[in-house]
Each structure stands twice: as structure tokens, then as C-alpha cells.
């Protein structure tokens, strides 16, 4: 029983640390608009340098959007990605 609990705990911890590839909120409805500089806003999961580059959620009361640093295991460092998440979520 102890090994099973240890394995489950390890798996849960790995998911929390590494995240899921689609956890930036791509499935949440968002508006793709043209920015003042002529470029299109960046969708969730795209690289960004500031929050104003990222597409906003259609429901701005329930969802928040922005540019945040996340750990990339593939690159071995932090990257800034656009995301959309639920305002009430502790991960937002």
C-alpha cells in the first residue's frame, strides 16, 4: 500500500510542477484582435513579453488573461507565455 501511495504522490507532484501542455487556457473563448502596432494578439500558449500582447477572454468577469513566466522543462529555464485562467482559481 505504501508504494502505491508514494507513486500517486509523485505523479501528482510531477503534474503540479510540470503542468499540462494545454493549461494556458487555449480552449477558453477569446477575442483575436489586431493590436495598435498592426500585429495580431497572441493566443494562449504563445511567447510574449508583456500582457498587452495577449488576447483577452470574451468573458472578462470570469476569466483573466496576461503574460506570465512559466518553467519550461524542455528549455531548462523560464519562458513568458500568454495565458487565460479562471479568476477564482488559485493558479491564476
From Swiss-Prot:
Top-level taxon of origin: Eukaryota
InterPro entries named in the record: Cys_Knot_tox
TM stretches of this protein: none
Keyword Disulfide bond assigned: yes
Expression across tissues: Expressed by the venom gland.
Signal peptide: 1-19
A GO molecular-function annotation: toxin activity
Major localization listed first in the record, in broad terms: secreted
One Gene Ontology term, aspect cellular component: extracellular region
Xref: Pfam families: Cys_Knot_tox
Compartments reported by the entry: Secreted
Keywords: Disulfide bond, Ion channel impairing toxin, Knottin, Neurotoxin, Secreted, Signal, Toxin
Intrachain disulfide bonds: 41-55, 48-67, 54-82, 85-92
Similarity remark: Belongs to the neurotoxin 21 family.
Free-text note on domains in this protein's UniProt record: The presence of a 'disulfide through disulfide knot' structurally defines this protein as a knottin.
Function as written in the Swiss-Prot or TrEMBL entry: Probable neurotoxin with ion channel impairing activity.
Name of the protein described by the UniProt record: Toxin ICK-16
